[in-house]
Amino acid sequence: MSRRQQRVEELIRREIAQMLLRGELRDPRLSPASAVSITGVGVSGDLSVARVYVDVLTESLRRDDVLDALVSGAGVIRTKLGERLQLRRMPELRFEADQSITRGARVEEILSELRDSGELE
């Protein structure tokens, strides 16, 4: 992965996270915005596509609803990114669920249960 790809990924991740925190995306499915986490961004080699990985940190929001809201607002998000970032061509945004945080928490829960039962030393 090139240095430029990494820089573009980080810029897109940071800007989308800021949009969510500032409430710039006026969709009730994204509220509270602090519960929506942009866990990562991956851009294609030609910078034409950016995969944005999203996780929901609370039970009050449904992951599918959040993804639907982001997909339906992808055009607005892309336009706002175009205004803020100095890129020749703004990548197409594709939002995907990132369940790594949820899976990690589940592994921790299982390990804790095993420690409590004495099966894990």
Predicted regions and their residues:
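Charge-rich, low-complexity N-terminal segments
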Residues: 1-49, 55-121
